[in-house]
Amino acid sequence: MGLTTVERFASRCIEIGVRWLIAAALGMVMSVPLHAQSTEAPQTHWEQYKHRNVPPQPDQHLTDPALVGAIDLHVHHDPDSYPRAVDAFEVARAAQERGLRGIVLKNHWTETGGPAYLVRKYATPGFEVFGAVTLDTAVGGLNPQAVRYLADVAGGLGRIVWMPTHDSEHEVRYNNESRPFVRVSRDGALVSEANEVIAVVAEHDFTLATGHVAGDEALLILRAAKAAGVKRLIVTHPMFLPQYTYMSLDQLRASVDLGAYIEIVGRSLTKDGESKDKTLAAVRTLGAQHFFVSSDAGLVGELNQTDTLAIAAKALRAAGASEADLTIMFKDNPAYLVKLPTLGGGAAPHAR
């Protein structure tokens, strides 16, 4: 005896339901994060960096005499496209409270002359706050118009132009990532766009920083900038991490021979390790007059800017730096690099 229409319909529904349950169960099994079954690609270095999920580091309220009158030329802040610990108003107020003379706001993706104007006006009147621009992909890479815009922003507070940082070809290739990058050189020579940007930096009397390029590229940039008439040059933290600029002692010596100032980021001195050892050795060998100290702090889960600077000062002092050396590295050289008089009224020691 055959099945009725109703019975056939019921049987079909049961079959579909069983198939759905089996598929759902298989989906649940396949979603279990077992290494043997996972088909997801691991997060890249940059994705991990952008999606930090760590608790904030409390302010330790550290102080040091070197901070009084200091200028931090490398201050990260919110708003940003990945987690920062404090916003621009908060970091400026904290720096002012600890006795700093000023800061330079830095963002990898946009200019900060505008934020500097607002911070000065509404958060810290009388405190020196300056802006900058970094030539990463968000501003068009090696885009001379981005430099011109910084010069035109109300307040005239732009001071530093960074060559590409997180989007530099060097960093992207070092981390083996597949994302857009900014190339500054080809076959051992700067690309034409780099030379055009350098010319605009010279025209507007900005300070030029080398960014996260390879060591040999940094030297190409410094030589071209000096030839173009750029007056103030920074080698961006070349003793910090190899995915950024990592220079040999000979390359550092060549940089200072070109008149550049070498950045020490406080983050490299907060923990023992290769970066700290390399930094202290470079200062001992080349002399404090060629260096300046910035924080490069601001990531969620890490020390804040003022605590970082205080620890850096103590580390340098413990390694043999004199109080005069600390004044040069925390106060005089940074002042020169943002076109302010030194506390003593003269030029920075290296620039004399």
Task: Report the location of each language-model feature.
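Catalytic pocket-lining loop regions of alpha/beta-barrel enzymes
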Residues: 199, 204-274, 292
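Mid-to-C-terminal alpha-helical segments outside catalytic/metal-binding sites
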Residues: 308-352
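Divalent metal-dependent hydrolysis catalytic cores, especially in the metallo-beta-lactamase
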Residues: 72, 76, 90-113, 126-137, ...
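Bacterial N-terminal signal peptides
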Residues: 17-31
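An N-terminally biased module of ancient metal coordination in phosphate/nucleic-acid-related enzymes
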Residues: 39-127
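Extended substrate/RNA-proximal surfaces in nucleic-acid metabolism proteins
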Residues: 126, 140-236
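Acidic (Asp/Glu)-rich catalytic clusters
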Residues: 116-125, 149-156, 226, 252-257, ...
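Short acidic/histidine-rich active-site segments
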Residues: 288-305
